[in-house]
Amino acid sequence: MCAALGDGHGGEAFYRWFAERSSAEQVTRDIESIPAAQTRMDQWEAQILARVMHKAECIFVTGEENRELIETMHMRWAPNVDAALCMAKERLGADASVTVIPDGVGVIVREGEA
């Protein structure tokens, strides 16, 4: 992911879902234990991000001033796209593919489609 985070991390409750837990797996376990009628603030955003983090390692490209925030949320920080691609290639190998999603809110990604 790439973002300047000019407005910070978004909702405080969203941030706390990750900052107060040891992993994305713990976020998922805690969310799954909440009855549907007792859904908490920003729960759905945390649930979606945790689901993504189960499937993929999230590398977040943003300024150094946001590094601690990103790492507290259990993602890897990178200072630029080149560094993020190097991290991904180290983990997945030189033949790994990259998916570019220009607008995360306006794009639906389906696995196995190009």
What residues fall within each predicted segment?
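C-terminal non-catalytic interaction/assembly regions of soluble proteins
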Residues: M1-A114
